[in-house]
């Protein structure tokens, strides 16, 4: 899964967030994007699509 639209600043780049938004905009149900830093310690930003009300 991928975490929240409250972007975790040092880890999620604007580009990643924008890409996620693009990916999710075509999704009929989960058309909102959530991004968050992976707490496992990986420097990656984790993004996924969620229902808009879950943001």
From Swiss-Prot:
Any idea which GO molecular function terms this record carries?
ion channel regulator activity; toxin activity
Q: Where in the cell is it found?
A: Secreted
The entry's note on the tissues where this protein occurs is:
Expressed by the venom duct.
Q: Does the keyword Amino-acid biosynthesis apply?
A: no
Naming one, the record's GO cellular component terms include: extracellular region
Q: How is it modified after translation?
A: Contains 4 disulfide bonds.
Q: Which residues form the propeptide?
A: 1-5
What are the record keywords, sorted?
Disulfide bond, Ion channel impairing toxin, Neurotoxin, Secreted, Toxin
Q: What does this protein do?
A: Probable neurotoxin with unknown target. Possibly targets ion channels.
Q: What is known of its domains?
A: The cysteine framework is XXII (C-C-C-C-C-C-C-C).
| Protein's recorded name | Conotoxin Cal22b
